[in-house]
């Protein structure tokens, strides 16, 4: 065994099973790439990303932990978001919530 190694049953694992999801189309209107990490509150991402922010309130990217999605300048792509879990309290990021969702 390697330190930190995970040994799972055979087959596929479904990430975030049973959690609410929403799909949004995102456009990078800026002149620089924007990278968003797996656990960043998507509602509060860089202002150069144009999308339905209210639909993203309380959601993050539905991707594996520790990974990210990069939005190139002028690029438009559709992403799936998954609801934040736990107490659903958000502090930090861009300071747009600072409390309970």
Swiss-Prot record:
CDD domains, sorted: Urease_beta
Domain of life of the source: Bacteria
Family note: Belongs to the urease beta subunit family.
Pathway: Nitrogen metabolism; urea degradation; CO(2) and NH(3) from urea (urease route): step 1/1
A GO molecular function held by the record: urease activity
GO cellular component, one term: urease complex
GO BP of this protein: urea catabolic process
PANTHER family documented for this protein: UREASE
Name the UniProt record assigns to this protein: Urease subunit beta
Name of the top EC class for this enzyme: hydrolase
Catalytic activity annotation: urea + 2 H2O + H(+) = hydrogencarbonate + 2 NH4(+)
Entry's localization field: Cytoplasm
Gene: ureB
Keywords: Cytoplasm, Hydrolase
Oligomeric and partner information: Heterotrimer of UreA (gamma), UreB (beta) and UreC (alpha) subunits. Three heterotrimers associate to form the active enzyme.
Enzyme Commission identifier(s): 3.5.1.5
């Amino acid at each position: 065994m390697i330190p930190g190694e995970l040994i799972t049953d055979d087959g596929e694992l479904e990430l975030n099973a049973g959690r609410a999801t929403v799909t949004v189309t995102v456009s990078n209107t800026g002149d620089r790439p924007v990278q968003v990490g797996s656990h960043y509150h998507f509602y509060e991402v860089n202002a150069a990303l144009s999308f339905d922010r209210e639909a993203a309130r309380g959601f993050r990217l539905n991707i594996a932990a520790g990974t990210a999605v990069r939005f190139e300048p002028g690029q438009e792509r559709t992403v799936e978001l998954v609801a934040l879990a736990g107490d659903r309290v958000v502090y930090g990021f861009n300071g747009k919530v600072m409390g309970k969702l």
